[in-house]
Amino acid sequence: MEFSKLIEILNNGDSGLIDHNLSSNPEINSAASLEKAEVNQISFIENASYLFNEINQTKASALILGEKVDITEKLDLKNIAWVTVKNPRIAFAEILEEINPTKVFPESIHPSAVIGNNVKIGKNIYIGANVCIDSNTRIGDNSIIHSGVVIYENVVIGKNNELHANCVIHQYSNLGDNCIINSNAVIGSEGFGFIPTKRGWRKMPQTGKVILGDNVEIGSCSTVDRPAVGDTVIGSGTKIDNLVQVGHGVQIGNHCAMASQVGIAGGAKIGDGVILAGQVGVGNRVKVGSNVIASSKCGIHTDIEPEQVVSGFPAIPNKLWLRCAANFKKLPELAKVIKKLNGSV
């Protein structure tokens, strides 16, 4: 695709096009990182301060630049086409979608698929090999069910969903529209509910269900448990990485983002727009307010008010944690000073 066509796409997109130079209007057929890009490939630069050598050595035919990246004269001398935008990551995503179009799956049901009684399948559905769909389940239009997916009874799957190979959707789960469930994820598995008795652990039946809003994405090997009663809810637009555990009865708001190995204990409530970095733990029935950001390995055991940035274990305001972390390595010397002071009293 000619670079000029990509400029038209960016001009109609969300990246905020500022300026561009077509140079020789190169043909762009793929994308790569700056240091590995070759002829007819495109890359992007958010910050040029640490990429001096890569910029000088790149063979890319075109570059997407952040608005503060001032290297256009150098690129002109190298005959490299460029475009400056407010958000180069969005621009890169828009171009990747254009030059790497999504595979189109034909409307079909593989002969090895097993489909139960009273299953309602919408229009333009693709169902791959060895899929198992139990009775009374509904699948919305334009959905893609890859090989090996297991869908239990009484599940509702909205329109335009994609369920990747070997994921499992348990009974009574409800998926909105435009959701993506990646391989080996499990939606609606039994919550971890046991009651201690004199004879050991008594299992609490888990009769609730999981509800996913629209545009939710669940990463590979992540699990979302159903509760004993009621619902586990993940709000619209929320994105969950691989290897994340969402406990029974958890309520997650809209447009949250959770990185790998986050664990959320049963009954916790997460507001809208919350960001949980890798390995964050949220305790049982804890409330995390909207737009909270929790840094990696943060342990949240008490309620967090909205709009806070927290770090550490247990979680404290990030600025306080940074001061504590800066002083941590000084503790042995401080202990010696305190010991001397105590001895002199």
From Swiss-Prot:
Give the matching Gene3D superfamilies: Hexapeptide repeat proteins (2.160.10.10), MurE/MurF, N-terminal domain (3.40.1390.10)
- One Gene Ontology cellular component annotation held by this UniProt entry: carboxysome
One Pfam short name? Hexapep
- Which InterPro entries does the UniProt entry name for this protein? Hexapep (IPR001451), LpxD (IPR007691), Trimer_LpxA-like_sf (IPR011004), UDP_GlcNAc_AcTrfase_non-rep (IPR020573)
Q: What is its EC number?
A: 2.3.1.191
| Keywords from the UniProt entry | Acyltransferase, Lipid A biosynthesis, Lipid biosynthesis, Lipid metabolism, Repeat, Transferase
Please name the catalytic residues of this protein: H248
Pathway where this protein functions: Bacterial outer membrane biogenesis; LPS lipid A biosynthesis
Q: Which domain of life is it from?
A: Bacteria
- Gene Ontology MF, one: N-acyltransferase activity
- Give the GO terms filed under biological process for this record: lipid A biosynthetic process
Q: List the disulfide bonds.
A: none
Catalyzed reaction equations:
a UDP-3-O-[(3R)-3-hydroxyacyl]-alpha-D-glucosamine + a (3R)-hydroxyacyl-[ACP] = a UDP-2-N,3-O-bis[(3R)-3-hydroxyacyl]-alpha-D-glucosamine + holo-[ACP] + H(+)
The Swiss-Prot or TrEMBL record describes its family as follows:
Belongs to the transferase hexapeptide repeat family. LpxD subfamily.
Q: What does this protein do?
A: Catalyzes the N-acylation of UDP-3-O-acylglucosamine using 3-hydroxyacyl-ACP as the acyl donor. Is involved in the biosynthesis of lipid A, a phosphorylated glycolipid that anchors the lipopolysaccharide to the outer membrane of the cell.
Assembly with partners or alone: Homotrimer.
Q: What is this protein called?
A: UDP-3-O-acylglucosamine N-acyltransferase
Organism, as annotated: Prochlorococcus marinus (strain SARG / CCMP1375 / SS120)
